[in-house]
Amino acid sequence: IREVSKGKLFSYGKKVIIIGILLSVFQQFVGINVALYYAPRIFESMGAAKDASMFQTIVMGLVNVIFTVVAILTVDKWGRKPLLITGSIGMAIGMFAVAGLAYFDIIGISTLVFIIIYTASFMMSWGPICWVLISEIFPNKIRGQAVAIAVAAQWAANYLISSTYPPMIEFSGALTYAFYGAMAVLSAIFVWKMIPETKGKTLEEMEELWKKQV
């Protein structure tokens, strides 16, 4: 039974499975859940008072909602790939800027501005669109198993990134944020080179696409 199941899973080749896993991993490795879980601590480490850091966290929450709506309104108009690449570039700019501010120990509203740029970029792209792509790229025959693997990879990546943030930030705040910025750059390259555009394509068309690549 296991051999049959394994054969079915790889009936369209391993590439589509690997792409699904990497899509999930990159969604977490850009550091979004660090920004969400540790937002007050990040702002306090940059010199904000406790009350101010909580207010800034609330602002981030509003940004999350607004730019998720932006993604909903634009995903079928602009396509998945352009939004993902644009989001990756925005996240990279935000994280590298925060890394620079941390390195030079610059405290002020600029930190909030660049974290908002980072968060907004994620929420208009990788936040919702990763899930859209996971539901669209896998052929019907393997969708159940493939989606389960991609989701498992996402939770594993989430745990890894979230649990390593405290020791990383203790070692170097600048390098920590630069790492997330670098992951954002890699995610843009990954989407550009590896992800097929699914806008306007039927599940049958996606199935044929993967068949040709086996």
Where are these regions (language model features)?
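Alpha-helical transmembrane bundle of multi-pass membrane proteins
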Residues: I1-V214
